[in-house]
C-alpha cells in the first residue's frame, strides 16, 4: 500500500525515532528499494504476462513446417522461410505494435481492449459506435480465445508423454481433461497461495527452452540466415495460397501478444518491456532456431520437434515443466477473462455477474462462478472434439487475430486524437501494423472450416449477448421513461401537500437522478410516508479504470428533505457503496447507518409483441436480466438495511 503524499513510511519513522540518518545512505536505500521493486515486477510479469506466447514453441513451428512440407521432404527453404516468418512476426506484431506502441497507450495505467475502447472514446470526446463495436468484438473474441488457449496449451504439453512413455499414449486426452477440471475447480479458492511460484516456474521455462535451442543450433547454423526478411518474402511469393495458410499457422507464435497490453495495469510498461527484450524474446528465438536446426539435421523429428530437442532421459521432466507452464498460461487467460467480464459489466455491456473475492488483500483476485463454469464446459468440449494439439491448431488464431485488428484500429484513434499526431503521421505509424494484422486475419479465415469456426462461434455468441443486453436496456429505459415523474415536480407537489414524515434517512437507488425512483413512488403510494431525509443515489462508471477519493462523491441539496448523491467508480473497480458513503460523511453529509434504509427496485420483465426486438431476443434479454446478480450484493449494501420494492414491466 502506498503512503499518502507527505507521509512517512514505517522504515522512515523508525529511523526518525532512533537516530539522525545519513542523507546519502537514505538516497541509496530509496534507490535500492525502487530497483528491487522494479525487478520484482519484471519477474512477476514473466509469470503472468508471457505464459501464452511462451508456450507457443510447443506446437507453432511444428505445425507450420509440417503443413508447408505437405507430406513431402522438409527442405531448407521451408525451414528458413517459416523461421523468418516467425521471427519477423514476433518483431512486427508483438515487439513493434504491442511492446513499443500500445503499452504507451495506457488508460490511467491500465490496458486491454475495453480500456483502449474507453480511452479512444475519451479522446474523441463522444461515444463512437465504431469504437464501441470494435471494443465489443475484440473483447468477445478474447473470451473465445480464453476457451481454446487452456485446451491447446495443456494438451500440447501432455502429448510429450507419447515420447517419454509410449504406453501412456491412450491416456493423453483423459489426463488433459483431469488437469483442466482441476484447474477450473480451484478457481473458487483463489490462486494467491501458488501465484508466488508462477514467476520462478516461467523463468525456468524460458531459460530451459533457450538452452534446448542453443544445444541444437550448431547442428545447422545456416538457420540463422532466417534473420533476413527476404526468406519470409520469398517463401510467401513461391507458395501462393499455401503461403497464406502457413501464415495462419505462423500466427500461433504470436498468440498471447495481446496479453502484454491487457496486463499493463498489473506490472507497468517498463517491467514488461524489460522482461520481453531481456528474457522472453531471446528465449523464444533461440528455441525456434534450435527446432529449425534439428529438423534440417534430423527430418524425422518433425513428429514433435519441441520434445525432440531434449535428451531422452530429460523428456519426462520436460513434460512436467511444460505442463506446469501451460497451466500457468491457462490461469493467466482465465484471470484475464474474469477481469474482462467485470469491466464489461461496469461499462454496461453485460448484466451484473456474481463476483466473489478470493483474497482479502488483492482486489483483483476475483472469481466469477458462472463464467468459470461456461469456460470449463467450452474447454472440455474443445479437447473432446479435436483430441490433439494439431487439430486444435486449426481452430486457434481467428479469435486472437480479430482482437489484434480491433486493437490496431482503436490504437490509431488514440495516436491521432489523444497524442495529437497529424493524421498522415498516425497512419504512417499504425496502418502498416494493421495491414499485417489483416493479413493474419485473412490467413486464419482460411482455417474456418477446419475448426476455426468453433472459437468464432463462441465470440459471436458473446457479441449477441452484449448486443441483446444493450438493446434491451435501451428499450427498457425508453418504456419506463414514459411513466416516470420528474423529481423536481414531485418535490414541489410534496411541499404543497406533505405526507406523514417519519424519522431517519431513506436512500433510493436509481439510474437517473432527474426522475423519481420507482421505489420512492411505491413508498408514497402504498405506505403513504416520507422520510425526513431522502437521498437519490446514482452509481456511475467512469471511462477511466479507477477514480480517486476526491472524485468519488458528488452531493447536491435539492430541498430541505431531498438531496442527490452520485458515486463514481472506475471500470476496473468493484463498487462498494458503504465505503463510498463514508467519504460522503467526511464531506459533511450527516447520516447514521443504523437509521438509514436503502430502497431498491426489483423489476420483473414480461415480453410484448411490440417490444422492438424479435421474440428470441426478448426471451434472451429477460433470461439475462433474471440471471443478473442482485444489486444489493453487487454494490455491497448491508442486507439488513435494505427494502426491496418489486415492479412488473412489460417491454
From Swiss-Prot:
GO terms for molecular function: potassium ion transmembrane transporter activity; symporter activity. Residues 1-31 are annotated as: Disordered. The keyword Transport applies. It is a multi-pass membrane protein. Transport of potassium into the cell. Likely operates as a K(+):H(+) symporter. Belongs to the HAK/KUP transporter (TC 2.A.72) family. This is Probable potassium transport system protein Kup. It comes from Nitrobacter winogradskyi (strain ATCC 25391 / DSM 10237 / CIP 104748 / NCIMB 11846 / Nb-255). The lineage of its organism: Bacteria, Pseudomonadati, Pseudomonadota, Alphaproteobacteria, Hyphomicrobiales. The gene is kup.
Amino acid at each position: 500500500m502506498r503512503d499518502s503524499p507527505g507521509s512517512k513510511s514505517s522504515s522512515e519513522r523508525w529511523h526518525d525515532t532512533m537516530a539522525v540518518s545519513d542523507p546519502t545512505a537514505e538516497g541509496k536505500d530509496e534507490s535500492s528499494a525502487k530497483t528491487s521493486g522494479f525487478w520484482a515486477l519484471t519477474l512477476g510479469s514473466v509469470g503472468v504476462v508471457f505464459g501464452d506466447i511462451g508456450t507457443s514453441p510447443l506446437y507453432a513451428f511444428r505445425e507450420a513446417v509440417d503443413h508447408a512440407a505437405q507430406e513431402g521432404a522438409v527442405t531448407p527453404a521451408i525451414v528458413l522461410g517459416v523461421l523468418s516468418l516467425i521471427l519477423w512476426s514476433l518483431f512486427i506484431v508483438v515487439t513493434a505494435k504491442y511492446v513499443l506502441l500500445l503499452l504507451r497507450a495506457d488508460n490511467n495505467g491500465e490496458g486491454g481492449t475495453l480500456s483502449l475502447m474507453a480511452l479512444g472514446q475519451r479522446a474523441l470526446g463522444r461515444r463512437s459506435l465504431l469504437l464501441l463495436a470494435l471494443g465489443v468484438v475484440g473483447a468477445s473474441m478474447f473470451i473465445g480465445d480464453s476457451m481454446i488457449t487452456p485446451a491447446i496449451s495443456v494438451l500440447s504439453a501432455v502429448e510429450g508423454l507419447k515420447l517419454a512413455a509410449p504406453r501412456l499414449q491412450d491416456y493423453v486426452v483423459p489426463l488433459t481433461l483431469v488437469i483442466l477440471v482441476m484447474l477450473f475447480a480451484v478457481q473458487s479458492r483463489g490462486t494467491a497461495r501458488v501465484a508466488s511460484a508462477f514467476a520462478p516456474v516461467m523463468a525456468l521455462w524460458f531459460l530451459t527452452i533457450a538452452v534446448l535451442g542453443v544445444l541444437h543450433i550448431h547442428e545447422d547454423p545456416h538457420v540463422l540466415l532466417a534473420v533476413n526478411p527476404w526468406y519470409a518474402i520469398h517463401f510467401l511469393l513461391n507458395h501462393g495460397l499455401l503461403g497464406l495458410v502457413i501464415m495462419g499457422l505462423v500466427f500461433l507464435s504470436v498468440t498471447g501478444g495481446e496479453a502484454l497490453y491487457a496486463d499493463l495495469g498489473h506490472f507497468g510498461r517498463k517491467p514488461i518491456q524489460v522482461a520481453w527484450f531481456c528474457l522472453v524474446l531471446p528465449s523464444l528465438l533461440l528455441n525456434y532456431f534450435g527446432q529449425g536446426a534439428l529438423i534440417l539435421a534430423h527430418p524425422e523429428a518433425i513428429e514433435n520437434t519441441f520434445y525432440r530437442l531434449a535428451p531422452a532421459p530429460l523428456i519426462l521432466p520436460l513434460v512436467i515443466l511444460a505442463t506446469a507452464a501451460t497451466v500457468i498460461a491457462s490461469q493467466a487467460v482465465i484471470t484475464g477473462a474474469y477481469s474482462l467480464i467485470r469491466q464489461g459489466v461496469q461499462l454496461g455491456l453485460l448484466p451484473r455477474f456474481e463476483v466473489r473475492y478470493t483474497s482479502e488483500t488483492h482486489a483483483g483476485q476475483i472469481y466469477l462462478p458462472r463464467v468459470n463454469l461456461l469456460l470449463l464446459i467450452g474447454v472440455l468440449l474443445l479437447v473432446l472434439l479435436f483430441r490433439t494439439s494439431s487439430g486444435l491448431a486449426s481452430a486457434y488464431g481467428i479469435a486472437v487475430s480479430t482482437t489484434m485488428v480491433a486493437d490496431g484500429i482503436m490504437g490509431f484513434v488514440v495516436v491521432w486524437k489523444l497524442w495529437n499526431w497529424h493524421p498522415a503521421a498516425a497512419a504512417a505509424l499504425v496502418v502498416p501494423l494493421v495491414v499485417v494484422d489483416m493479413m493474419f486475419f485473412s490467413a486464419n479465415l482460411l482455417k474456418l472450416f477446419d475448426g476455426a469456426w468453433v472459437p468464432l462461434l463462441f465470440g459471436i455468441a458473446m457479441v449477441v449477448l452484449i448486443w441483446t443486453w444493450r438493446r434491451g436496456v435501451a428499450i427498457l429505459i425508453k418504456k419506463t421513461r414514459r411513466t416516470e415523474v420528474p423529481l423536481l415536480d414531485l418535490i414541489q407537489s410534496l411541499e404543497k401537500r406533505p405526507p406523514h414524515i417519519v424519522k431517519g434517512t431513506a436512500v433510493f437507488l436509481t439510474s437517473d437522478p432527474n426522475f423519481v425512483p420507482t421505489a420512492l413512488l411505491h413508498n408514497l403510494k402504498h405506505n403513504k410516508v416520507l422520510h425526513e431525509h431522502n437521498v437519490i443515489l446514482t452509481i456511475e462508471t467512469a471511462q477511466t479504470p479507477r477514480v480517486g477519493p476526491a472524485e468519488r462523491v458528488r452531493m447536491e441539496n435539492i430541498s430541505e428533505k431531498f438531496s442527490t448523491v452520485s458515486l463514481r467508480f472506475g471500470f476496473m473497480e468493484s463498487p462498494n457503496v458503504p465505503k463510498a458513503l463514508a467519504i460522503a460523511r467526511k464531506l459533511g453529509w450527516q447520516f447514521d447507518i443504523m437509521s438509514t434504509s436503502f430502497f431498491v427496485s426489483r423489476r420483473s420483465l414480461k415480453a410484448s409483441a411490440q417490444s422492438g426486438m424479435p421474440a428470441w431476443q426478448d426471451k434472451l434479454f429477460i433470461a439475462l436480466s433474471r440471471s443478473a446478480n442482485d444489486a444489493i450484493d453487487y454494490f455491497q449494501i448491508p442486507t439488513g438495511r435494505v427494502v426491496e420494492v418489486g415492479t412488473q414491466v412489460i417491454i
